[in-house]
Curated annotation (Swiss-Prot):
One of its GO terms (biological process) is defense response to bacterium. This is Defensin-B3. Lowly expressed in spleen, and expressed at lower levels in kidney, lung and testis. Keywords: Antibiotic, Antimicrobial, Cleavage on pair of basic residues, Defensin, Disulfide bond, Secreted, Signal. Belongs to the beta-defensin family. The lineage of its organism: Eukaryota, Metazoa, Chordata, Craniata, Vertebrata. InterPro entries: Beta_defensin_dom. It holds the Pfam family Defensin_beta_2. Has antimicrobial activity. Residues 1-21 form the signal peptide. It is found in: Secreted.
């Protein structure tokens, strides 16, 4: 029975996404001068992905031309 519980908890841990990569992507986005948001606004450019919880896009305001 204990062995079954161990495999159950290991399978739950295996499905959890790693948090380290999300934190580092948010930091990289901020270094580029952007911010993480669920959706980029019309005047913003999509730089990449943050993948931290629900804030999936790295957005930065476009420079006026």
């Amino acid at each position: 029975m204990r062995l079954l519980l161990v495999f159950f908890f290991l399978s739950l841990l295996d499905q959890a996404p790693p948090a380290r990569s999300g934190i580092s992507r948010v930091r990289i986005c901020r270094e580029k001068g952007g911010h993480c948001d669920a959706d980029c606004h019309l005047e913003e450019r999509h730089l990449g992905g943050c993948r931290a919880a629900y804030l999936t896009f790295c957005c930065r305001k476009e420079s006026p031309r």
